[in-house]
Amino acid sequence: NRNEGYGGLNQTFFSVGFKVFDFLNFGVSANYNFGKITNESSRQEQNIDFGTFFIKTSSLVGFNYRFATQLKIQLTSEVRLDAMAYYVPKNSLNATNESVYFTRSVTTQNLGDLENVDLAASNLKKTSISLGDQYSFGLGITKAKKWFVGGQYSQRNSADYVNNFISLDNITYANGSRLSFGGFYLPDYSSITSYWKRIVYRAGVRFEDTGVLFNNQALKETGISFGVSFPMAGYSNANIGVEFGKRGSQDNDLIQESYWNLIVGLSLNDIWFVKRKFN
């Protein structure tokens, strides 16, 4: 027997922020989420060429909102204390589902019998996936254009997660959380003699309870990351980072995996609406 899944969610959003006081900001984001997830289960027997496959696919759409606030307290003329918090209310995703059974040759990969499942008959053609609320708060100290160090705690109430279409017998859910610490260092942002002094160096570490229970055992992750931001023309940057992590545990006959991620991105910035000095 084999189970595998792939896919995920994409997000587009619109955000607006307000300055309540010089030291206090408030913002709200409206998010449109969309994507597709697929679960494939298969069964193959020894000395039998054809295996049985069962594929479930859900196309997902939904909206949610995020409310956030930021507090800035000037400790000295150069050093500032930053605090933040956000909250995402409980929401749901609308799912349009498809399911198919088929047999396939192990040696030639040729398809055998194929049958589309009538999901409408079992009221599973269109379903709703419930997502719990989530919140986060963080605290950090920074010296403008020089360094930053801080931490953040986040919790997702994933015990409320419900998916009536795609589920596994040995997978359940509990509330998940993440605790992370990190910072950056910029040697000299205004240096004109050394390009390397204008590079931002970053590092971080995280400890995460994913909220997924496998055979009633919590699936946890830890990770450490390093990155650099290379200044480009104008106000833009090229960002490169790498993360090394571990997921799972070897306790109770479970599996622990080690992985690494390479992150590459661009931060494209410019100044708009500059008032003319000369006509």
Predicted regions and their residues:
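Outer-membrane beta-barrel porins/channels
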Residues: 1-279
